[in-house]
Regions:
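A short, flexible loop at the N-terminus of ABC-type nucleotide-binding domains that lies
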Residues: 2-10, 14-27
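Helix-to-loop junction immediately C-terminal to a conserved catalytic motif
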Residues: 56
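Conserved ABC transporter NBD signature motif
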Residues: 64-73, 81
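Conserved catalytic motifs of ABC-family nucleotide-binding domains
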Residues: 91-101, 111-113
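Conserved ABC ATPase "signature" region
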Residues: 116-135
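Conserved ABC ATPase signature
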Residues: 139-143, 147
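ABC ATPase C-loop
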Residues: 156-157
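Catalytic Walker B motif of ABC-type/P-loop ATPase nucleotide-binding domains
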Residues: 164-168
Length: 227
């Protein structure tokens, strides 16, 4: 069960586009507890991706405040914050090189040097994902969209963040691979269920039911249910 203290809290978040005189996010308030699994659902254009990017502090806010462990997120805490709150894009960016080089890449940065690359863990996850070990030697340039998503997911999970923000991580995958991703993420969560938190955007209602302790429903830039 999640702790009572929010690990992330959004208070009245808003995103405004002057050119269109439109609020893309409006009055979004949300508490995310440590150890919680949240799935965000809603129609296309409802603000699901923008919500995740805002929770990751990747886009500027025009209203409201984001809090991490009770402290307002500002530019002064961003490197530490982003090492603990990791966002997985629908179209992840990979460096030129092999899958293995992409997985090892984050560990050169000081915010991740307290962690280590765990080859045995990666091999286990590859088996769950029904991928052969030689997948690690594949060039990032030769990866399909689904394989790139898998690579980025493995890279994110091995960093053991406090919060993993997943933007439709199975959208480009076949059903068997999607099932493997669900199993991987569930295993990752269960390794430390009191400390790890997942916020997952999905268009699949059955997937949402499987993966969520709580569902948020978005419409027209607002959370209309579940907050």
């Amino acid at each position: 069960m999640p702790d009572d203290e929010p690990i992330l809290e959004a208070r009245e978040l808003g995103r405004y586009v002057p050119a269109t005189n439109k609020w893309l996010l409006q009055h979004v308030s949300l508490e995310v507890a440590a150890g919680e699994r949240i799935v965000v659902v809603g129609p296309s254009g409802s603000g699901k991706t923008l919500l995740l990017r805002s929770l990751a502090w990747l886009d500027p806010l025009d209203a409201g405040t984001l809090y991490w462990r009770g402290r307002a997120v500002t530019r002064h805490v961003v490197p530490r914050f982003r090492s603990r709150v990791v966002y997985l894009h629908q179209r992840p960016a990979l460096i030129a090189g092999t899958v293995a080089e992409n997985l090892q890449y984050p560990f050169q940065f000081s915010v991740h040097r307290s962690r280590r690359f765990d080859a045995a863990q990666i091999e286990h996850w590859l088996r769950v994902l029904r991928r052969e070990p030689d997948f690690l030697q594949k060039s990032s340039r030769d990866l399909s969209g689904g394989e790139a998503q898998i690579t980025a997911l493995l890279r994110a999970m091995q960093l053991t963040p406090d919060v993993l923000l997943l933007d439709e991580p199975t959208a480009a995958l076949d059903p068997a691979s999607a099932q493997g991703v669900e199993q991987c993420v569930s295993q990752w969560f269960q390794e430390a269920p009191q400390q790890r938190t997942i916020v997952w955007v999905s268009h699949d209602q059955e997937q949402a039911a499987r993966m969520a302790d709580r569902q948020l429903v978005m419409a027209a830039g607002r959370i209309v249910q579940g907050a």
